[in-house]
Curated annotation (Swiss-Prot):
Any Pfam family the entry gives: Ribosomal_L2_C
Presence of keyword Nuclease: no
Gene giving rise to this polypeptide: rplB
Lineage top rank: taxon: Bacteria
Gene Ontology terms: cellular component: large ribosomal subunit
UniProt cross-references to InterPro entries, sorted A to Z: NA-bd_OB-fold, Rib_uL2_dom2, Ribosomal_uL2, Ribosomal_uL2_bac/org-type, Ribosomal_uL2_C, Ribosomal_uL2_CS, Ribosomal_uL2_dom3, Ribosomal_uL2_RNA-bd_dom
Recorded family membership: Belongs to the universal ribosomal protein uL2 family.
GO molecular function: rRNA binding; structural constituent of ribosome; transferase activity
SUPFAM superfamilies: Nucleic acid-binding proteins, Translation proteins SH3-like domain
Protein name in UniProt: Large ribosomal subunit protein uL2
Region annotation Disordered: where it falls in the sequence: 32-58, 225-277
An individual GO BP term: cytoplasmic translation
Source organism of this protein record: Borrelia duttonii (strain Ly)
Keyword set, alphabetical order: Ribonucleoprotein, Ribosomal protein, RNA-binding, rRNA-binding
Length: 277
């Protein structure tokens, strides 16, 4: 999917870029049976307090229900009926129509087009877009939408342009190199989808103006040094100051280089190599 630029008729258009959406199917509304209403929480938790700052507003969205597991359709071929936009995630989504008449959305892999036939299951061919257990995928292949627990559905590598690589297979576990650089052992019966996630140009888009961030539900980010001392550890001072200490969060946690992962976490034994920092 290409990048669209604009003539600078206004200052806000000078650096703004958007995706061209050439790959999307024309005239396709989302399938009503696979969508549901989505209430914006504006960063509030169940008690009404702000738990995630700088969230709120934005365009109303309907949630598209994505089949991350594809386990109950083993051995049933499906035709790609449409490639659609999803406002809730960075990649596009593909509408699959199975031979038994059922319809499902999946994350659209790079290179999958309308009319392609996809399949899931241990006997599915090695083809981009097919979902297989990790033990059935050859070493060196790129995968995405990887399960961590059998039957829970894909949890890893679901963002636009992302992919992991099968590094080795030994016993009950397959070693996978994740986009972060981490090498992790995953149980061989877990499912993964072959290929890369599509819409790889998403990372090259320039928002260009503050208003578009508001359309996306992102509110302004105020610097700590611009606040009062009661609001932030960097606040206060006469005139413009640098904060006077190493960068920290509003609650005093160091912002740079501070390790937040729990010591002796249960999943440490599955990590062969830590991620690239």
């Amino acid at each position: 999917m290409g990048i669209k630029t604009y003539r600078p008729k206004t200052s806000s258009l000078r650096y703004k870029t958007t995706l061209s959406f050439d790959e999307l199917s024309k005239g396709n509304d989302p399938l009503k049976s696979l969508t549901k209403g989505k209430v914006s929480r504006a960063g509030r938790d169940s008690s009404g307090r702000i738990s995630v700052r700088r969230r709120g507003g934005g365009h109303k969205r309907r949630y598209r229900e994505i089949d991350f597991a594809r386990r109950d359709k083993f051995g049933i071929p499906a035709r790609v009926a449409a490639i659609e936009y999803d406002p809730n995630r960075s990649p596009n989504i593909a509408l699959l129509v199975y031979r038994d008449g059922d319809k499902r959305y999946i994350i659209a892999p790079k290179g999958v087009k309308v009319g392609d036939i996809l399949e899931s299951g241990p006997n599915a061919p090695i083809k981009i877009g097919n979902a297989l257990p990790l033990e059935n995928i050859p070493v060196g292949k790129m995968v995405h939408n990887i399960e961590l627990n059998i039957g829970k559905g894909g949890q890893l590598v679901r963002g636009a342009g992302g992919y992991a690589m099968i590094i080795a297979s030994d016993g009950d576990y397959v070693t996978v190199k994740l986009p972060s650089g981490e090498m992790r052992m995953i149980f061989k019966k877990c499912i993964a989808t072959l290929g890369e996630v599509g819409n790889e140009d998403y990372m090259n888009v320039s928002i260009g103006k503050a208003g578009k961030s508001r359309w996306l539900g992102r509110r302004p980010k105020v610097r700590g040094v611009a606040m009062n001392p009661i609001d932030h550890p960097h606040g206060g001072g006469e005139g413009k100051t640098s904060g006077g200490r190493h960068p920290v969060s509003p609650w005093g946690q160091p912002a740079k280089g501070y390790k937040t992962r729990k010591k002796n976490k249960y999943s440490d034994k599955f990590i062969v190599k830590r991620r690239n920092n």
